């Protein structure tokens, strides 16, 4: 009887733990780490959730503008409480989501702002493409405007897409 009760408690504890992990729903938490220009760690109920900003692709760390993109994401989110709207979980277990952080606007007004969009609008990231097509039409419009204005990475006439850079780097090591 005691072992059955212990097993039942263990199952109940596991269910509570699984249900309390916000990996399958929208959540709020504090950004505790910036991995690169499109990936952050968010602390939620003493658990760290890795979040990949959906629909954008920032330069890699070893790539031109990689450090600047990472720094800009840090400026916008580090130690801030953010809201994440989850789109899906990728094959690496990362939450793909839209990140909203409080930004202060002229006149002192603060409002939650789409950080994914800011990164693309400021030329710190590309609109993400899947088989050559943007996954979000609005992000692609932001990218075209940033490119037109030569903002951020678009100031470099030789800016290389992260997916091409990753492929070239992988081929160089093989």
UniProtKB/Swiss-Prot annotation:
The keyword Hydrolase applies. One of its GO terms (molecular function) is nucleic acid binding. InterPro entries: SNase_OB-fold_sf, Staphylococal_nuclease_OB-fold, Thermonucl_AS. Keywords: Endonuclease, Hydrolase, Nuclease, Plasmid, Signal. SMART domains: SNc (SM00318). The active site is at 52, 60, 94. PROSITE patterns: TNASE_1, TNASE_2, TNASE_3. Gene3D superfamilies: 2.40.50.90. Residues 1-23 form the signal peptide. It catalyses: Endonucleolytic cleavage to nucleoside 3'-phosphates and 3'-phosphooligonucleotide end-products. Its EC number is 3.1.31.1. It is an enzyme of class 3 (hydrolase). The keyword Signal applies. It holds the Pfam family SNase. Belongs to the thermonuclease family. This is Micrococcal nuclease.
């Amino acid at each position: 009887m005691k072992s059955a009760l212990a097993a039942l408690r263990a199952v109940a504890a596991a269910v509570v733990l699984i249900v309390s992990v916000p990996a399958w729903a929208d959540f709020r938490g504090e950004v505790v780490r910036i991995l690169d220009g499109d990936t952050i760690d968010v602390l939620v109920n003493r658990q760290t959730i890795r979040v990949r900003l959906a629909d954008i692709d920032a330069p890699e760390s070893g790539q031109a503008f990689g450090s600047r993109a990472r720094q800009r994401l840090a400026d916008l989110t580090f130690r801030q409480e953010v809201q994440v709207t989850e789109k899906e979980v990728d094959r690496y277990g990362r939450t793909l989501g839209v990140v909203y952080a409080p930004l202060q606007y002229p006149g002192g007004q603060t409002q939650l702002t789409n950080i994914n969009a800011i990164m693309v609008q400021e030329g710190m990231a590309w609109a993400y493409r899947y088989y050559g097509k943007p996954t979000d039409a609005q992000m692609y419009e932001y990218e075209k405007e940033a490119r037109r204005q030569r903002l951020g990475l678009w100031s470099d006439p030789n800016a290389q897409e992260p997916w091409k850079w990753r492929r070239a780097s992988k081929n160089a090591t093989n």
